[in-house]
Design a protein with these regions (language model features):
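Conserved beta-strand hairpin/beta-sheet module of binuclear metal-dependent hydrolase folds
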Residues: 8-12, 17-67, 154-171, 188
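Active-site environment of divalent metal-dependent phosphoester hydrolases
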Residues: 36, 84-86, 109-110, 151-152, ...
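Active-site neighborhood of phospho(di)ester-bond hydrolases with catalytic His/Asp-centered motifs
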Residues: 51-54, 74-82, 103-105, 167-170, ...
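Active-site metal-binding motif and surrounding structural segment of the metallo-beta-lactamase
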Residues: 57-104
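Metal-dependent catalytic neighborhoods of phosphoester/phosphodiester hydrolases
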Residues: 88-97, 113-114, 252-259
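Metallo-beta-lactamase
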Residues: 105-156, 160-163
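Cap/insert and terminal regions of metallo-dependent hydrolase folds
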Residues: 177-280
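Short, basic/aromatic-enriched C-terminal tail that caps enzymatic domains
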Residues: 276-292
């Protein structure tokens, strides 16, 4: 297990990097989001972290090329949980960049069961982490937190660097108060808005799968997200970017998710208005890089 950061993930002074003359503290590139594969890149000038590895080598490289990123190295791969859409490409990613893997012990055991032998052969160091733990990778401070999902030990993450904070929070059945606390004071919030309740009920999934999605260890509905966004005691509206992610192809669509979120944001008190940008992450193509 790695040592927790002694300052418990408080921001440490660093330097921002430049993009076209503009100073950037942290860049976020959501390369894919959805049930067919999840992949997010976080960068400072000196550190590069990949969150999840749900795409194969060829598609991962193609997505990076489409946003003009040619990575000669990675400093870490972090895995939120062992479901295929978050880890299927992990053996190839580890082989490509020979980077350390950061994962909880129960999730690591699950990965060893569900991934091929090439996964074990390509490991280049495993850093065991725990929910609630804070640690640093380069100049990025990371905080892992527990989320309610039907996996071995699912976690979300917050990242701090150069005064900016990013949160990655998908694959959870509901929004516990502690999760809401972790998401406060976030400048880029990547939040699941998986399904529309009515579309799910009449959709193609078998009833047992619908029950799983709707459970407290399933996925967040548009309605659950709207209730969170409308509540100033939950969502603090600090975010410069609010990204709706992990949108179901079968039981949702981007317009429905966006309208639900926009309506919720109009219900906020005047003194707590959201003035940031509402964005939709896609399964099929990267979102433009978000710079903080």
């Amino acid at each position: 297990m790695i040592d927790s950061h002694p300052a418990l993930c408080h921001y440490f002074a660093g330097f921002a990097f430049s993009s076209g003359g503009i100073s950037i503290g942290l860049r976020v590139s959501i390369l894919a989001s959805g049930s067919s594969g999840n992949l997010t890149l976080l960068e400072t000038e000196s550190t590069r972290i990949l969150v999840d590895a749900g795409l194969g080598k060829r598609e991962t490289l193609a997505r990076l090329a489409s946003i003009q990123r040619d990575l000669d190295r990675l400093d870490a791969v972090l895995i939120t949980h062992e479901h295929a859409d978050h880890c299927n490409g992990l053996p190839q990613v580890l082989g490509l960049w020979k980077t350390p893997l950061y994962v909880t012990e129960p999730t690591m055991a699950a990965l060893q069961r569900c991934l091929p032998e090439t996964f074990r052969k390509r490991l280049n160091g495993v850093e065991t982490i725990e929910p609630g733990q804070c640690f640093s990778i380069g100049d990025i401070d990371v905080h892992a937190f527990a989320i309610p999902h039907d996996a071995a030990d699912p976690i979300g993450f917050t990242f701090r660097a150069n005064g900016a904070k990013v949160a990655v929070c998908t694959d959870l059945g509901y929004m516990p108060q502690l999760v809401k606390v972790h998401l406060r004071e976030t400048h880029c919030l990547i939040l699941e808005s998986n399904h529309d309740l009515d579309m799910l009920k009449v959709g193609p999934y078998p009833w047992v799968v619908k029950q799983r999605v709707l459970s407290r260890t399933g996925h967040l509905s548009n309605h659950a997200v709207s209730e969170y966004l409308a509540d100033p005691d939950g969502f603090d509206a600090v975010a410069r970017y609010l990204v709706l992610a992990h949108i179901s192809r079968e039981n949702n669509n981007p317009d429905v998710a966006r309208i639900s979120a926009e309506e919720a944001l109009t219900r906020r008190p005047v003194e707590s208005t959201f003035s940031g940008e509402l964005l939709i992450a896609s399964q099929d193509s990267p979102l433009r890089p978000l710079e903080l």
